[in-house]
């Protein structure tokens, strides 16, 4: 941190007192999740109130306030809370998929530790119980949560094997899930490049035919495909997806932002495949939310 923690806390206090949402967002965007947590701890020690409570008292509520509050919460605690919320009542399957795929092994294990202690149940078991085991996407999620990967050994053979799985008259959901859940990212990117070279289409495009009858299956495998190319690549794809509805998907964009904005530069680069992130955020979200999102992701309006 180039500024002292005391200076940052003072700047934050001023922004909160002035209800300056963009300044709060800008300060949050300047620091990593671990650094934000240290700042939050110092803020509470200095001003005798949690920064999250200070923001809630100052701002006028709504999703934008929630987003700014959650920027100052431990990402492991926040993900655990989001997973618990997604599993409650009628399960939010879209949220479950985002939270499972948009997470590296280390963060997953840390989140599980927080979840297991806070909610007194095993996170992986809770997710599996909520989504069942019959659908293709549920099988993929179950395997993915294991975070057990190893080199498969032969890229050329794996390309042929994957093509056979995709082209089979009846999709073998167990085998397909096992392939995606156990292949290392380094080897998968080689497989993906070779697959595209051999068959003149990407793996995610090839998966449309066997999975097109169920949008959830297709979305899950697309997420797995992009995640294996790097979480910023998946974040870009999910941001683009959140920008497709006329008024944007606020719940989704907030989940993605709080969990992935630390990797904004890589995500911005990956987003070029879809267009201009700043312009899309401005087009899809309201005049309060859009500037906050652009600030956090460090993108400008077109």
Curated annotation (Swiss-Prot):
GO molecular function, one term: phosphatidylserine binding
Keyword presence, Cell cycle: no
Protein name, per record: Giardin subunit alpha-5
GO biological-process terms attached to the record: cytoskeleton organization
Family: Belongs to the annexin family. Giardin subunit alpha subfamily.
Species of origin: Giardia intestinalis (Giardia lamblia)
Annexin repeats: 1-72, 74-144, 153-226, 230-298
Subcellular location: Cytoplasm, Cytoskeleton
Protein role: Giardins are involved in parasite attachment to the intestinal mucosa and in the cytoskeletal disassembly and reassembly that marks the transition from infectious trophozoite to transmissible cyst. They may interact with other cytoskeletal proteins such as microtubules in the microribbons or crossbridges, to maintain the integrity of the ventral disk.
Pfam families named in the record: Annexin, ANXE1_4th
Coarse class of the protein's main subcellular location: cytoplasm
Stored Gene3D superfamilies: Annexin
One annotated Gene Ontology cellular component of this protein: microtubule
């Amino acid at each position: 941190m180039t500024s002292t923690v005391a200076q940052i806390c003072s700047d934050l206090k001023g922004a909160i007192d002035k209800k300056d949402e963009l300044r709060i967002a800008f300060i949050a965007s300047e620091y990593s999740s671990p650094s934000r947590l240290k700042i939050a701890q110092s803020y509470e020690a200095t001003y005798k109130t949690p920064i999250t409570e200070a923001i809630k008292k100052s701002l006028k509520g709504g999703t934008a306030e929630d987003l700014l509050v959650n920027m100052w919460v431990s990402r492991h605690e926040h993900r655990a809370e989001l997973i618990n919320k997604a599993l409650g009542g009628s399960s939010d399957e879209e949220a479950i998929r985002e939270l499972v795929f948009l997470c590296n092994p280390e963060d997953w294990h840390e989140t599980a530790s927080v979840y297991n202690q806070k909610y007194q149940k095993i996170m992986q078991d809770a997710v599996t119980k909520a989504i069942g085991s019959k659908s293709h996407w549920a099988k993929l999620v179950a395997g993915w949560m294991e975070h057990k990967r190893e080199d498969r050994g032969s890229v050329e053979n794996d390309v042929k094997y994957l093509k056979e799985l995709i082209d089979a008259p009846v999709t073998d959901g167990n085998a397909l899930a096992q392939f995606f859940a156990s292949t290392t990212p380094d080897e998968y990117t080689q497989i993906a490049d070779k697959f595209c070279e051999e068959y003149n289409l990407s793996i995610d495009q090839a998966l449309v035919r066997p999975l097109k009858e169920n949008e959830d299956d297709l979305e899950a495998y697309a997420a797995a495909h992009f995640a294996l190319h790097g979480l910023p690549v998946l974040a870009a794809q999910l941001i683009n997806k959140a920008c497709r509805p006329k008024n944007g998907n606020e719940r989704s964009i907030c989940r993605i932002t709080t969990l992935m904005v630390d990797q904004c530069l890589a995500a911005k680069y990956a987003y070029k495949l879809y267009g201009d992130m700043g312009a899309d955020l401005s087009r899809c979200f309201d005049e309060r939310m859009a500037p906050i999102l652009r600030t956090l992701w460090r993108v400008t309006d077109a």
